Amino acid sequence: MTASPDYLVVLFGITAGATGAKLGSDEKELILLLWKVVDLANKKVGQLHEVLVRPDQLELTEDCKEETKIDAENLSSAPQLDQALRQFNQSVSNELNIGVGTSFCLCTDGQLHIRQILHPEASKKNVLLPECFYSFFDLRKEFKKCCPGSPDIDKLDVAAMTESLNFEKSDSVSRYGASQVEDMGNIILAMISEPYNHRFSDPERVNYKFESGTCKMELIDDSTVVRARGLPWQSSDQDIARFFKGLNIAKGGAALCLNAQGRRNGEALVRFVSEEHRDLALQRHKHHMGTRYIEVYKATGEDFLKIAGGTSNEVAQFLSKENQVIVRMRGLPFTATAEEVVAFFGQHCPITGGKEGILFVTYPDGRPTGDAFVLFACEEYAQNALRKHKELLGKRYIELFRSTAAEVQQVLNRFSSAPLIPLPTPPIIPVLPQQFVPPTNVRDCIRLRGLPYAATIEDILDFLGEFSTDIRTHGVHMVLNHQGRPSGDAFIQMKSTDRAFMAAQKYHKKTMKDRYVEVFQCSAEEMNFVLMGGTLNRNGLSPPPCKLPCLSPPSYTFPAPTAVIPTEAAIYQPSLLLNPRALQPSTAYYPAGTQLFMNYTAYYPSPPGSPNSLGYFPTAANLSSVPPQPGTVVRMQGLAYNTGVKEILNFFQGYQYATEDGLVHTNDQARTLPKEWVCI
């Protein structure tokens, strides 16, 4: 609770575009600023002041011209934004005769005038706003506190407030903007008088700057997160904060997303302090950052934690010094040392803390990845460092990029939590032989490319028309990207090569929801490669990460056991057993033994009906096995992530279970819950 100001300055802004609830959503510039001073102590209202503002683009919408009676000729000789703000500041200072102990605060009709007009436009034009624009009273919220029985805030405009107070509409001022300021002054006088006696004591705040920091695995409200898409590759968290200037982003709440190769994919997740600020951020959909327009969509707290959460001790220690500028180095020699990095930047851009300000990225086995993060104390040092982009360190040129705390976490988490590829040992979990595996050279599948992201399986069936009856059971496979979202691709398994060929010929480049879709004939092998994370292009097949050569490939094989289905398993439904889905090579799970590390980037999350790519090795089509000891496999779902072997065995206390070697941890990327397999 802060002290009530001596004066309120009622402020109202008009842009060259939309008005009312859509004010500022069309990115139009400010053209008129109106204000009036209210003396709270003496309960007096001052004179109306206004100043025209010349925008960079002298184009006004027809609605704006009709409401404001302003045209381009009036604006051609008007002052620009910085000059208009100086006039405003000078006028208020002269009228209030501000001295020691005198205070005033702005008061607006809602949040839009300050958060969606003045701050974003001033940021784009590099105009420094006066101190008074970083705190203001929202008259709608104050009126709701004063009159709890009034309409909801989203419906509470100036007209609704005057109606609630039973004011007679004044005909003395009829111009748009001027009439609103006149009514707001009268509303304030009524609120501070009997019987309300309202005190203006808790103003809204606008953050001066974005605070970087780490994000812990805490509960995040889904209604506070947005996804920004289409960002320039070199953009940083500070650029994102500047795009959302005027809205309060939570500390460390701007997280840049990385693709499967660890490079930025042009997306970011942004967490705001409240749902109100998130909703205002959504109104900036397709606003511009430089020459690029940025798409803004709703996201979830889970999405944000996947990108920015899970800070390790190493990362937390590195980022413990706040307000540091982070630069990412890429392409370092694997033998590079901290001393060489310090010498690379030199005296003109000293690293914060010397060697302590450098964080090398390594694989889980300690091998360097060629990446590192460096801290600089100020923007000037960081800019000097970025000028060394593509300079040589040893015999390799080094790429330098502005980075963020969230990117440090992502990169470290990505490499430190890479999946471990176990050496093949005799399988212990029965895998039933599949009923049918198509020859890899039979082109009885089709690939759909360029699907709308919102396309469903039903949309695909409608798109294929008569050929939808020729699709095999569970034969539609949607390809997801590394974030679990549709990639625009899908594979369809047809009943014959002829029908696949005819479908590809007939529907190639036909439209689905205003987008033309490319249809190609392909084989089951090509489909499996893509669904497991590989790429299919004109140059042929690029294998998925799990198909890449291991660092130390095993040099031995195991005898194939006889394919037998245990009688104990016959009482269970097929869905409860590890039965591979149709049209997928037979697979077998292996226990965790001696581990190898794979150069891991990311996998496509497998959609239902698609082959999974984690936790097992492809084996020969006729290979299947049973546990070496009699028993039955029981599947457990919904386990907590920190559940260990001891907790599972305690759960089965009283039953005779196999040794701990008979318990296999699996991690299904297509699921959000862990599961365990126990041999009893």
UniProtKB/Swiss-Prot annotation:
The lineage of its organism: Eukaryota, Metazoa, Chordata, Craniata, Vertebrata. CDD domains: RRM2_ESRP1, RRM3_ESRP1_ESRP2. GO terms for molecular function: mRNA binding. PROSITE patterns: RRM. The keyword Metal-binding does not apply. Residues 224-301, 325-405, 444-524 form the RRM domain. It comes from the Eukaryota. It is found in: Nucleus. Disruption phenotype: Homozygous knockout mice die soon after birth due to complications from cleft-lip and palate defects. Knockout embryos show alterations in inner ear morphogenesis and auditory hair cell differentiation. The modification Omega-N-methylarginine is found at R581. The modification Phosphoserine is found at S542. Its main location: nucleus. mRNA splicing factor that regulates the formation of epithelial cell-specific isoforms. Specifically regulates the expression of FGFR2-IIIb, an epithelial cell-specific isoform of FGFR2. Also regulates the splicing of CD44, CTNND1, ENAH, 3 transcripts that undergo changes in splicing during the epithelial-to-mesenchymal transition (EMT). Acts by directly binding specific sequences in mRNAs. Binds the GU-rich sequence motifs in the ISE/ISS-3, a cis-element regulatory region present in the mRNA of FGFR2. Belongs to the ESRP family. Keywords: Methylation, mRNA processing, mRNA splicing, Nucleus, Phosphoprotein, Repeat, RNA-binding. InterPro entries: ESRP, Nucleotide-bd_a/b_plait_sf, RBD_domain_sf, RNaseH-like_sf, RNaseH_sf, RRM_dom. GO terms for biological process: alternative mRNA splicing, via spliceosome; branching involved in salivary gland morphogenesis; epithelial cell proliferation; epithelial tube branching involved in lung morphogenesis; positive regulation of epithelial cell proliferation; regulation of inner ear auditory receptor cell fate specification; regulation of RNA splicing. GO terms for cellular component: nucleus. Epithelial cell-specific. Epithelial-specific expression in diverse tissues and organs with particularly notable levels of expression in skin and gastrointestinal epithelia. This is Epithelial splicing regulatory protein 1.
